[in-house]
Every structure is written in C-alpha cells, then in structure tokens.
UniProtKB/Swiss-Prot annotation:
GO molecular function, one term: protein-lysine N-methyltransferase activity
Chain residues that bind S-adenosyl-L-methionine: T158, G179, D201, N244
InterPro entries: Ribosomal_L11_MeTrfase_PrmA (IPR050078), Ribosomal_PrmA_MeTrfase (IPR004498), SAM-dependent_MTases_sf (IPR029063)
Keywords: Cytoplasm, Methyltransferase, S-adenosyl-L-methionine, Transferase
UniProt xrefs under HAMAP family: Methyltr_PrmA
A biological-process GO annotation: methylation
GO cellular component, one term: cytoplasm
Name of the protein in its database record: Ribosomal protein L11 methyltransferase
Amino acid sequence: MNKWQELTIEVNREVEEAASNILIESGSQGVTIDDSADYLENADRFGELYPEVEQVETVKITAYYPESADIEAITKQVNDRLDELTDFGLETGDIHLVTQELVEEDWAENWKKYYEPARITHDLTIVPSWTDYEASVGEKIIKLDPGMAFGTGTHPTTKMSLFALEQVLRGGETVIDVGTGSGVLSIASSLLGAKEIYAYDLDDVAVRVAQENIDMNPGMENIHVATGDLLKGVTQEADVIVANILADILIHLMEDAYRLVKDEGYLIMSGIISEKWDMVRELAEKAGFLLETHMVQGEWNACVFKKTDDISGVIGG
C-alpha cells in the first residue's frame, strides 16, 4: 500500500489561494482547505448538520506528497515562499507548519469530504469531478478536480470574476484568460456563450491542470491553453480579458490589455486587496479604461473596466 506525506500550514485567510498555489508548485499531489467560514456559509445548504464552529481569521491548508518526497526540504521551500508573500502586500500571519505520514486510502477519501457542489452565481455551479450531479433547468455545470486547487471557484476573487463574466458575456465573444490556474474562468466563459477562449499561465503545472479540467467538461474545444507571461507577445484581440491574479502583477498588463481589448470591450480584474485598489484603478484609467463595475467581498476587490468613449455607463460618468 502506498504511503503519502502530509504537510499542513495555517495562514491568514487572505492568502488562502496564493498559499495553495505555492503548495501545488512545490510538488503536492492535491490540497484540502479547512476554513471555518465555509462551515458557517454552507450550514444547512445541503441539508447536512455541521458542528458548531467558531470563525477564526486563519485557514488550514493540507498538502499531500509522495513518500519519496524530501518533506524537510519542501517545508523549508514552502515557508520561504510564504514569507515572500508579504512583498505583495499580503499578510500571512503567524505561519504554522506540521507534517505527518498517512496511507493512500486515507488521503483518497479524506480530501474529498471537503468539497460539495457549490452554486456560485445564478447560472454557474461548480461540481467536483467525482460527483454525480443533476443540473436544474438553466443551470450550467463546471466540473473541476479541486485536488489541484488552482482556484476552485469558491474563493471570493474567483466568485467575483464569475459574476463579472456573467455581467458582460452575451454570446459570440473572444475571451483571453490571463493566469488561468484551474481553467475555471475559461470553462465558465465557454458555458456563458463565448466563441473562442485563449487561456494563459506562466506556470506549466497550471497549464496542465487547466487542460485536464477543460477536458472533463464536454464541448470545450473552443478553449486554447498555452504557457504565457501575462499578455507578452499576444496579438489576438479580444472582446473580454479576465485576470484573477495579485494586484502587483495586474499592474504590468494594463497597456497590453488596452492594446488587445476591442472598442467597447472589457477588462475584468480580481485578486486585488483593498489597500491596492486605488493603485490598480489609477493605472487602468491611465491606460485608457473607464470603470464600469466595482465589487468588494471582505478584503478583496474585483472590477470591470470598459474600453469606450461613452462615459454615460461608467462610474463617475
């Protein structure tokens, strides 16, 4: 029977997605996230009873590695990279790391219990890949393998990105998804009627994961995934560009985004902590975009900017 090594970290909730990505990039075969806020938000949602849980500001993220992995070296690497998140204005809080061994059958079942189908927007529901789920009339299903956890649709930044896509897509558009991660925004774009979607990520692991998730959703032949550094070298124009990445990275794509977005097209950005919002808005407007929608959930901000000369439908217009 195969054995696995388990690494659990406890960090502030605001770095949940970034920390999950760090664990995946360190070689983890999957992660689970234990967040007290999820118990409170989902209580009675699926007709289940949850234990009483006190909401705290931290989350526990558990990653799983093969028995052969050098867990001590991985722990040091993860700790160093978590420390670097403060350079992006993110507060990790006091970092706690714990390791232990477990057998494969324990992992195979344990991590799955954290995931249930989740209706994210009016139209879109995220369903774990192993779950049989019957959609209601008009409900659009996104099948994901949350074990790879590059944004499973439940994080506030991803939720707001999905709401924004619902807002702007009417059918027939070309979409560029920058920093695609799990591919969830590309899959959603296709379900919402986009004609062609081009998804890019700098990380080869994310590109592979995105393609695997896309392949488990039927009718996604219009999504094209490739390795790419933001929008560098991209010549394909788009009706919509969506980017759910950290603010300090978003600021480097503004000019390329304005170059590629068609007139009357949109730039959707998420992953912006509150203290970075003014900076992102200023640089987007300096590039030529006008703010149409601003969304806030907790410390996270998302926005829809439009490339237009008509100021009547924009904030401040």
